[in-house]
């Protein structure tokens, strides 16, 4: 299976490794310093992240990435200068926060309201459907998540707004539970990560 080498795609598989307790190495991923702030967030949340076989290919730094969880994830706060290099991964951070211990707060991320969808509102609406017990607060420039155990594993219908990052993020959430998700569309994923569903099925299901 061919896995994209860009970090924005690899981020979903890194999260999947952590939430499913798999340790599948991702080979030759672009690890440009401006794109890998997500790895720092995962470390702060308690994940073990390791880079191996660093090299330069076509003027881009690449490395093999392994990710695992040695203890429970913990909630964190992210704002200010950290946000620009994380903006595309914030939906995925919200998914990780659902399974963490303690509150996660994201601020200064108003740009999310002007992506393929209003990612703040759509993300929180879908989190509430996925797990009605989670505590959510919506801000104009972000949100707060207080995790709670999901006692209901019934299937859930989620609206995507045609936003590929919303879809992929909740696919990763489903891997950590027994919950089945029905999306109103999935075609938009092919624009950013062709073969995403095939990789998920082969590696994690």
Where does each model-flagged region fall?
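Short, structured segments at the rim of ligand-binding sites
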Residues: 1-205
């Amino acid at each position: 299976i061919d896995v994209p080498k860009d970090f924005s795609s690899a981020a979903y598989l890194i999260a999947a490794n952590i939430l499913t307790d798999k340790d599948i190495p991702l080979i030759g991923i672009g690890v440009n310093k401006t794109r890998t702030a997500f790895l720092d967030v995962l470390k702060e949340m308690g994940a073990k992240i390791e880079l191996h076989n660093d090299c330069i290919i076509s003027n881009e730094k690449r490395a093999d990435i392994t990710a695992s969880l040695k203890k429970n994830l913990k909630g964190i706060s992210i704002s200010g200068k950290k946000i620009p290099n994380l903006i595309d991964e914030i939906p995925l951070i919200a998914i990780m926060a659902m399974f963490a211990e303690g509150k996660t707060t994201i601020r200064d991320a108003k740009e999310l309201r002007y992506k393929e969808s209003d990612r703040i509102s759509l993300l929180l609406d879908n989190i509430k459907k996925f797990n009605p017990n989670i505590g959510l607060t919506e801000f104009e420039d972000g949100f707060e998540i207080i995790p709670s155990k999901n006692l209901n594993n019934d299937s859930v219908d989620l609206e995507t707004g045609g936003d590929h990052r919303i879809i992929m993020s909740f696919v990763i959430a489903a891997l950590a539970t027994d919950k089945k998700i029905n999306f109103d569309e999935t075609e938009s994923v092919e624009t950013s990560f062709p073969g995403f569903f095939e990789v998920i099925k082969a590696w994690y299901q």
